[in-house]
Amino acid sequence: MKDSLVLLGRVPAHPDSRCWFLAWNPAGTLLASCGGDRRIRIWGTEGDSWICKSVLSEGHQRTVRKVAWSPCGNYLASASFDATTCIWKKNQDDFECVTTLEGHENEVKSVAWAPSGNLLATCSRDKSVWVWEVDEEDEYECVSVLNSHTQDVKHVVWHPSQELLASASYDDTVKLYREEEDDWVCCATLEGHESTVWSLAFDPSGQRLASCSDDRTVRIWRQYLPGNEQGVACSGSDPSWKCICTLSGFHSRTIYDIAWCQLTGALATACGDDAIRVFQEDPNSDPQQPTFSLTAHLHQAHSQDVNCVAWNPKEPGLLASCSDDGEVAFWKYQRPEGL
């Protein structure tokens, strides 16, 4: 099992600082990293080496917590502890901050683009989730402020093909939102984690959602539409989400991030025990009660907490990770034979 995750290289992405988050561009050719040094770095390959192509240092006054590429790949959004979100426009190797989104009362913890590229979501320690609309002139307007959580909101993620938004919070819940008559509403609350929910990832179909938590478990939730054959109760026309699998006993500390590979279906986790783990759904497992096996476990992936794992969207098995040690590492995952 140990050979199924092979190190390709490491870069000191944010020296003397934490590296908080990573995001691949849609083409899979560039990786954005962000950190406690207030900087964003853009990484690309030259030959077999990963090199820094750009440093975005002018946008933020405090830690940059998360970054996200627009679906077209021409824009990068960055969420910062300075309570702002910057929108950067890519022009060849250069990036220009074209807009700064203000409104959150304190630290912005996450930012995510909808698959259409016309909507952006942000969330904050102020307990709110904001939905922004983007028009043809690249003007951003807040169209909804959602106050469904009772604590710090850690992460937002969009469904891969629908305008359905999910958020994870310090209040131990996951919430889902959709648009209804020109406003956004909370359409589901997923309860079951016993501590902070740190991150979320939809599977390639969008029918399942994975969540990871300070309670050291991963939960897999499945969407059931009204009138479903399984007889899962739904309220009105809203789908119901039910926990169909819990991965427990694998992680010894907080699970900070989870990534669901859109190409292979492999599930990777970033953990406070300095390790990276990869899980695969077992062949012939029951869709209503799936089982997953641990197929890779790298104990010392980094020298400190692993904060993020990110699968490349185009190259199967290429995984990037980052850590409190300031480094970004690149890995090749190969599914073990016989699984």
From Swiss-Prot:
Biological process according to GO: chromosome segregation; iron-sulfur cluster assembly; protein maturation; regulation of transcription by RNA polymerase II
SMART domains noted in UniProt: WD40
SUPFAM superfamilies referenced in this protein's UniProt entry, alphabetically: WD40 repeat-like
Keyword Nuclease: no
WD repeats mapped onto the chain: 14-53, 59-98, 103-142, 148-187, 192-231, 250-289, 301-339
CDD domains: WD40 (cd00200)
Compartments where found: Cytoplasm
Annotated Gene Ontology cellular component terms: cytoplasm; cytosolic [4Fe-4S] assembly targeting complex; MMXD complex
PROSITE patterns xrefs: WD_REPEATS_1 (PS00678), WD_REPEATS_2 (PS50082), WD_REPEATS_REGION (PS50294)
Short sequence motif named LYR motif, residue ranges: 176-178
Keywords, alphabetical: Chromosome partition, Cytoplasm, Disease variant, Repeat, WD repeat
InterPro entries, alphabetized: CIAO1/Cia1, WD40/YVTN_repeat-like_dom_sf, WD40_repeat_CS, WD40_repeat_dom_sf, WD40_rpt
Keyword Magnesium (UniProt): no
Protein family membership: Belongs to the WD repeat CIA1 family.
Function comment: Key component of the cytosolic iron-sulfur protein assembly (CIA) complex, a multiprotein complex that mediates the incorporation of iron-sulfur cluster into extramitochondrial Fe/S proteins. As a CIA complex component, interacts specifically with CIAO2A or CIAO2B and MMS19 to assist different branches of iron-sulfur protein assembly, depending of its interactors. The complex CIAO1:CIAO2B:MMS19 binds to and facilitates the assembly of most cytosolic-nuclear Fe/S proteins. CIAO1:CIAO2A specifically matures ACO1 and stabilizes IREB2.
Record's subunit section: Component of the CIA complex. Interacts with CIAO2A and forms a complex with CIAO2B and MMS19; the interactions with CIAO2A and CIAO2B are mutually exclusive. Interacts with CHD1L, ERCC2, IREB2 and POLD1. Component of the MMXD complex, which includes CIAO1, ERCC2, CIAO2B, MMS19 and SLC25A5. Interacts with WT1. Interacts with CIAO3. Interacts (via LYR motif) with HSC20.
HAMAP family on file: ciao1
Disease entry from the Swiss-Prot or TrEMBL record: Multiple mitochondrial dysfunctions syndrome 10: An autosomal recessive disorder characterized by proximal and axial muscle weakness, fluctuating creatine kinase elevation, and respiratory insufficiency. Additional features include learning difficulties and neurobehavioral comorbidities. Some affected individuals have mild normocytic to macrocytic anemia. Brain imaging shows increased iron deposition in deep brain nuclei in some patients.
Miscellaneous notes: 'Ciao' means 'bridge' in Chinese.
PANTHER family in alphabetical order: CYTOSOLIC IRON-SULFUR PROTEIN ASSEMBLY PROTEIN CIAO1-RELATED, WD40 PROTEIN CIAO1
Protein name: Probable cytosolic iron-sulfur protein assembly protein CIAO1
Organism: Homo sapiens (Human)
